[in-house]
C-alpha cells in the first residue's frame, strides 16, 4: 500500500478543491493510505472528505500572520506537520501548499506540484516567498509539475523558465457527467424570461463587475432578461453594492454560493464566463455537459475548455466584445441555436474516467 500525502491551501468553494474531492473519492483505499494536509483549515468541503482520508490542518484560517509564518518558516512548518515518510506527495494547488511540501528532502519520495492558474497574469503566490528566486527553487524541488491546461504550462515556462516545464504533464480536470446531469434535476429554478447564468467565486479575476456593467447596458437597450450570478467571495459585497446602486435588482440576481449550482446552469438559456484570467474553468465544462450555450472571454485554458471554439463561442477579452456577443443572442435567434448545437456536441465528450486514470498514473509514476 502506497502512502500518499495531498496538500491544499483551503477547502473553500473553488475548482481545485472540487477536483481534489473527486480524486480522493476515486482513489482505492485498498491501494493508498491517504493523508490530506490543509494549510488553512477553512472551507465548506471538510464534511465531504471520505472517511478513510486522514486530515490535518496547520492554521485555523487565513491571516497575515499565517502568511508571514509560511514565507519565513516553511521548513519548520513542514517538520512540525509532516512527521511521517510518504511514497508520494502532491501539492494540489500553487502557493502555500507548494511552498511547504517543497521542503521535503526525502530522496525516496516522489513529489508533484499541480498548477491551476496563470501566475503570469496575476502573481498571487509571491506573498508566500521571500523572493522570486526562492519560488523558482521551490518548484525545482518537485519531480514533476502538472498543469490543468496547456496554456498554463506555456505561461508558467515563460515566467519561471522553460527548464521547469520540460518534464511537465498536462492533465485536464475530470468531471463526472452522469452526476452533474442528475444533480441538475434536484430542484426547480424560475425561468419566465431569457435567462443568463454565470457561476464562480466572486473575485476580481472572474470579471463579475464588468458583467454587471454589461447587464446595465442591456437594460438601457430595453432587453428583458434575468442574470443569475451563482457564487460567493471577497468581492461579493462590492458586487451587491454595484447592483443596488445602479438599480439592477429586477434583472441581476446574486444567488450566493450553492453547493449544487447545476439547476441554475441547466435552466439558463445562456452561460457566460466573463473572466479576466482563468486556469481551467470547471463551470464552463459543466455548462457544456448540460448542453447549455456558452459564451466566454478568451483567457488561459478557455480554448481547451471549449474545444478551440467547437463547443462554445470565444470572444476577445474586452467588455465591449462580450456585450456584443451576448446581444447577438437576443437579436439573432439563429446564433443562439448554433451555440446550442455546439454545446450539445461537446456534451457527449465523456472524458471523466480517462482523466482520473491519468492522474492516478502520474501519482504512480508511470506517466512521463
Label each PLM-derived region with a short phrase.
Residues 240-256:
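Nucleotide-activated donor-binding/catalytic signature segment of Leloir-type glycosyltransferases, i.e.
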Residues 6-14, 18, 22, 26, ...:
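N-terminal strand-loop element at the rim of the active site
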Residues 91-97, 115:
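Short His-centered aromatic/hydrophobic patch
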Residues 14-22, 194-217, 223, 234-240:
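A conserved mid-protein helix/loop that constitutes part of the nucleotide-sugar donor-binding site
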Residues 308-319, 328-334:
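Conserved acidic donor-binding segment of nucleotide-sugar-dependent glycosyltransferases
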Residues 293-296:
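Short hydrophobic beta-strand element within catalytic cores of glycosyltransferases
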Residues 99-101, 140-167:
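A short, active-site helix/loop in glycosyltransferases that binds the activated sugar's phosphate group
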Residues 257, 276:
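Aromatic "clamp/platform" in nucleotide-sugar-dependent glycosyltransferases that forms part
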